[in-house]
Curated annotation (Swiss-Prot):
This is Bifunctional protein FolD. It catalyses: (6R)-5,10-methylene-5,6,7,8-tetrahydrofolate + NADP(+) = (6R)-5,10-methenyltetrahydrofolate + NADPH; (6R)-5,10-methenyltetrahydrofolate + H2O = (6R)-10-formyltetrahydrofolate + H(+). Its EC number is 1.5.1.5, 3.5.4.9. InterPro entries: Aminoacid_DH-like_N_sf, NAD(P)-bd_dom_sf, THF_DH/CycHdrlase, THF_DH/CycHdrlase_cat_dom, THF_DH/CycHdrlase_NAD-bd_dom. Keywords: Amino-acid biosynthesis, Histidine biosynthesis, Hydrolase, Methionine biosynthesis, Multifunctional enzyme, NADP, One-carbon metabolism, Oxidoreductase, Purine biosynthesis. GO terms for biological process: L-histidine biosynthetic process; methionine biosynthetic process; purine nucleotide biosynthetic process; tetrahydrofolate interconversion. Pathway: One-carbon metabolism; tetrahydrofolate interconversion. It comes from Bifidobacterium adolescentis (strain ATCC 15703 / DSM 20083 / NCTC 11814 / E194a). The gene is folD. The lineage of its organism: Bacteria, Bacillati, Actinomycetota, Actinomycetes, Bifidobacteriales. Homodimer. GO terms for molecular function: methenyltetrahydrofolate cyclohydrolase activity; methylenetetrahydrofolate dehydrogenase (NADP+) activity.
Length: 291
């Protein structure tokens, strides 16, 4: 059985460190604040946003909430974005996605002040990541890709020269994690697989590391991986469990793979907690840049 990479434990350590940094900021007269814009009342989105504000309270970051009805117009959402751009109490903020049908999400994200982009997904910040493959980056980083890399570092997993197979081309991780993995400081070789990839399982068998972000429950099987590989499971699917009569969250990696792996992230309990921790880290770093 491979090593279980505990995202909850690493996230807790990260938040403890951030709490100390927030205290130092407060001593210098800077109070970090995280804003959220929530449109509608989707249960998943409501729960996720509530979790972010609970995290804020845990480390001493103020919460700024903007809630709009399901039938909010583009202009109303845009106004909420502009208000947070102008609010000095808001260090950084996120627009909870997805937005209701008919609202152009990319157009809304474009309106975010890049310096307050807590998710690290503004085109300017992604462009900075593309342009600067070496040295320090002083713009916010995408939370989930950053969380994956920090999680592996916490377990002393060196990615230098490793073959990494990324499954899925979604913007949250699939298309963005390669930008971090191929930076000189990480130095991995990345293959991005998607629905148009031929012989995807051949790519998986060659990989030292698989980052699964397809949202297809149990897609990665034991016969698809080589002995001693590292499995990072980011996929999320809600699957009905007949035994319990309830829906359960399932990852993209079949648990039978754990026997062959050198290390693996459980799902849930792996990458998810680190994504939330990296959101806080972005906000604290934004505040520290004000010093």
């Amino acid at each position: 059985m491979g090593t279980r990479i505990d995202g909850k434990k690493v996230a807790a350590r990260t938040k403890a460190d951030l709490a100390k940094r927030v205290e130092l900021l407060k001593a210098r007269g800077i109070q970090p604040g995280l804003g959220t814009i929530l449109v509608g009342s989707d249960p998943g989105s409501v729960k996720y946003v509530a979790g972010k504000h609970a995290d804020c309270a845990e480390i001493g970051v103020n919460s700024i909430k903007r809630e709009l009805p399901e039938n909010a117009t583009f202009d109303q959402v845009a106004d909420a974005v502009r208000q947070l751009n102008a609010d000095p109490a808001c260090t950084g903020y996120i627009v909870q996605l997805p937005l209701p049908r008919g609202i152009d999400e990319n157009a809304i994200i474009d309106l975010i002040d890049p310096k307050k982009d807590a998710d690290g997904m503004h085109p300017y910040n992604l462009g900075e990541l593309v342009l600067h493959a070496r040295g320090d980056i002083t713009t916010p980083l995408p939370c989930t890709p950053r969380g994956v890399i920090e999680l592996l570092r916490a377990y002393d997993i060196d990615l230098d020269g490793k073959e990494v197979c990324v499954l899925g081309r979604g913007i949250t991780i699939g298309r963005t994690i390669g930008l971090l993995l191929t930076r000189k400081a990480v130095n991995a070789t990345v293959t991005l697989c998607h629905t148009g990839t031929k012989d995807v399982r051949d790519h998986m068998r060659r990989a030292d590391v698989i980052v699964a972000a397809m949202g297809v429950a149990g897609f990665v099987k034991p016969e698809d991986i080589k002995e001693g590989s590292i499995l990072v499971d980011v996929g999320v699917s809600r699957v009905f469990d007949e035994e319990s009569g309830r829906y359960k969250v399932k990852g993209d990696v079949d648990k039978a793979c754990y026997e062959k792996a050198f290390a693996y992230t459980p799902n849930p309990g792996g990458v998810g907690p680190m994504t939330r921790a990296m959101l806080l880290q972005n906000v604290v770093e934004m505040a520290e840049r004000q010093l």
